[in-house]
Swiss-Prot record:
Name of the encoding gene: rpsP
Disulfide bonds: none
Protein name: Small ribosomal subunit protein bS16
Protein's organism: Lactococcus lactis subsp. cremoris (strain SK11)
GO cellular component assignments: cytoplasm; small ribosomal subunit
Ribosomal protein in keyword set: yes
NCBIfam families named in the record: S16 (TIGR00002)
Family membership noted in the UniProt record: Belongs to the bacterial ribosomal protein bS16 family.
């Protein structure tokens, strides 16, 4: 089972916000997921991202692949740097 960390669209028409979910790569975008690890609201001026960092790091260390957009969000939050540092220290 290939696992991805990706965005799930929520909200109403023209007012989206996204949940950052861990899901099987074969599941549809807004379909079944394993765990919610954060949220992302692009409508706020600072593009608010909330994350459960320890859970994201755990999923990344277990082999979950982030989508391109999620990878950018994690990089801006500093999570990818922590992941690479922990990977190099092993």
């Amino acid at each position: 089972m290939s696992v991805k960390i990706r965005l799930t669209r929520m909200g109403s028409k023209k007012k989206p916000f996204y949940r950052i979910n861990v899901a099987d790569s074969r599941a549809p975008r807004d379909g079944k997921f394993i765990e919610t690890v954060g949220t992302y609201n692009p409508l706020l001026t600072e593009n608010q991202v909330t994350l459960k960092e320890e859970r994201v790091l755990e999923w990344l260390s277990n082999g979950a692949q982030p989508s391109d957009t999620v990878r950018n969000l994690l990089s801006k939050a500093g999570v990818m740097k922590k992941f690479h540092e922990s990977k190099l220290s092993k």
